[in-house]
């Protein structure tokens, strides 16, 4: 994809984000915007997968779910649902797709109850599945009853509807082979823009690309391929993704203390095309409860943010101590979590 098209998508998504901004803080409108983008991506991805699976049956995903029920229809629905769960880890019935929400908006309907159910259905579809931990509570930060969206129910519905309509006009490129590059890049750009607006708090969830690139290149020195990579304070996962990409790592592991940032990290993994079975992000304080114990890792990267003498160490401060305090392990033995001090 050309840089021109890449920049166009970035600009379009940032314009959508600013429709939500209003009186919200950078972090508040970040969670709503990124959550809605992610919902559209999941909807388009599953619709494409299901339609491709039904080509020989000469029906579409939506048509199959509106057909009169009989044994054959139910069996085919079961086959499609199973294929989706095995391949992408979740399932969305056609009536809860992003495109169905758009149809309701165009009919001037109140879409908030339906949207809330749609997000919940995505999470619930993974219960008992191998992907349950990757999707559980993923949309918990999207509070559609929040007064930040408007004073009245109508105000909230109007604002959210306008944002979703604006997203509907943007081509995410899910039909194209470059979908991962397109959305992954745009999502990272959005997070970086929100980080810029968050000021000193940015270091809690985002590592600038320059820092990520340096760490990722160091961690791959002398290694054509890493088996796995780990970040004990992974934030939104940008550093992990960069290290995994440059090191061609098969598996990604991370832990994040902040529940909201933990959700961003999982979304970031999925939007970059990392299969649910190839990453494991845990929510918790690594110092108090290390989720990975004696797990062996080929490499560890970290951009830790902490208080030192009352001063918050952000990623920019950390740049001065990277060589001394980021320890990169190509492990043949169990490792202990590593931190900046």
Regions found by a protein language model. Name each.
Residues 1-214, 218-219, 280-286, 291:
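Non-catalytic, mostly N-terminal accessory regions of nucleic-acid modification and defense proteins
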Residues 197, 251, 323-325:
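A short, mixed-charge helix-start or loop-turn motif at secondary-structure junctions
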Residues 201-302, 307-309, 336:
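Conserved S-adenosyl-L-methionine
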Residues 306-337, 341:
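Mobile active-site "lid"/loop adjacent to the S-adenosyl-L-methionine
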């Amino acid at each position: 994809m050309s840089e021109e098209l890449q920049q166009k998508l970035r600009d379009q998504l940032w314009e959508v984000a600013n429709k939500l901004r209003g009186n919200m803080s950078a972090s508040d409108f970040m969670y709503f915007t990124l959550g809605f983008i992610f919902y559209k991506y999941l909807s388009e991805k599953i619709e494409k997968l299901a339609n491709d699976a039904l080509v020989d049956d000469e029906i579409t995903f939506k048509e199959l779910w509106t057909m009169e029920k009989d044994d054959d229809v139910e069996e085919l629905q079961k086959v499609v649902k199973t294929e989706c769960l095995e391949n992408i880890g979740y399932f969305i019935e056609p009536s809860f797709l992003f495109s169905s929400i758009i149809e309701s908006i165009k009919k001037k309907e109140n879409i908030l109850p339906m949207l809330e159910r749609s997000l919940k259905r995505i999470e619930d579809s993974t219960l008992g599945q191998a992907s349950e931990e990757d999707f559980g509570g993923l949309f918990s930060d999207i509070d559609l009853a929040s007064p930040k969206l408007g004073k009245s129910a109508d105000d909230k519905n109007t604002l959210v509807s306008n944002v979703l309509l604006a997203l509907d006009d943007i081509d995410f490129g899910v039909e194209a082979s470059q979908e991962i590059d397109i959305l992954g890049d745009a999502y990272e750009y959005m997070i970086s823009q929100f980080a810029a607006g968050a000021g000193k708090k940015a270091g809690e969830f985002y590592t600038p690309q320059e820092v990520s690139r340096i760490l990722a290149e160091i961690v791959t020195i002398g290694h054509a391929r890493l088996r796995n990579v780990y970040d004990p304070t992974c934030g939104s996962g940008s550093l992990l993704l960069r290290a995994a990409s440059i090191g061609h790592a098969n598996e990604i592991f991370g832990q994040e203390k902040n529940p909201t940032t933990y959700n961003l990290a999982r979304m970031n993994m999925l939007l970059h095309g990392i299969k649910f079975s190839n990453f494991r992000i845990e929510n918790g304080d690594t110092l108090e409860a290390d989720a990975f114990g004696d797990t062996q890792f080929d490499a560890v990267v970290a951009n830790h943010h902490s208080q030192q003498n009352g001063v918050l160490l952000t990623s920019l401060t950390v740049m001065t101590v990277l060589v001394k305090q980021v320890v990169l392990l190509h492990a043949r033995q169990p490792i202990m979590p590593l931190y900046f001090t």
